[in-house]
Amino acid sequence: MILPHDISRRAFGAMVLGSTAAACAPQIDDAIAEPVLPAQEDWVEGYGPILDAGYNLPGIPARYLEGVNRRITGLYQGEAPPNSLDVDPYAKFLYHVKADGTATRYPVGVGRAGRSIRGRATMQFMRAWPGWTPTQNMLRTEPEVYGDFRAGIPGGLRSPLGARALYLFRGGRDTFYRIHGTNDLPSIGNSGSAGCIRLFNQDIIHLYNQITAPMPVLIRSPAESLRVDPENYDRGMELPPTMIAAEELIGPDAEAANRPPDLDALSPGMI
């Protein structure tokens, strides 16, 4: 079993290991293809394959989990109140802040320049295996990226929102920003979305199981990020939009691949 390494950072001191849309762009769904699973001992702890609601989620390869790009729990040194979510879009982390002074930190992917929510919001409700529909603004500004998906994509392995989604509201109104899972593994730790906050599917499932709605959310400003975590400020890179052929996500072949597997047909060791 691979154990986390090179994770400690001053801004999130005294770390210890954990116990184990909207305005969101569609991404290539690695889960549609039949996954080739490495040997069990090659999975990083907490990031192996998961069978969830009949869907077979593949594990996350170790190359995407280097350094700080994995989930850990330790002392919280940020400025958000207990029982809240603290998002640092510059260091590319999300913290679940707990009442005992600790937090679980998750690596995230965030919006490209100028495409992110800032300030305070409320996570009003949560959904498992959510569907996704591009907003009118997305269709208007980037029709070449989103036009083929204007009718939406139902929840499941094809959905760009992944295994779970948390819906952000402000002043009682939907912001159309989400905190959600993704199959676009290279985007975690980078800026590449249309504004939403992405987590590995294993991480969004872990977070979903720890929280309840409603919950306050703080999205840090540049000054807050520099003050709390200067070492990781502005880590990662900006990625271009991912162009996807419509047949990857819609059509008979995609629909067939999206169906949950027959649980009775699963062989031992498959997950």
Q: Language-model segments: what does each one mean?
A:
Residues I2-I197, N201-I271:
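N-terminal pre-domains immediately preceding structured catalytic cores
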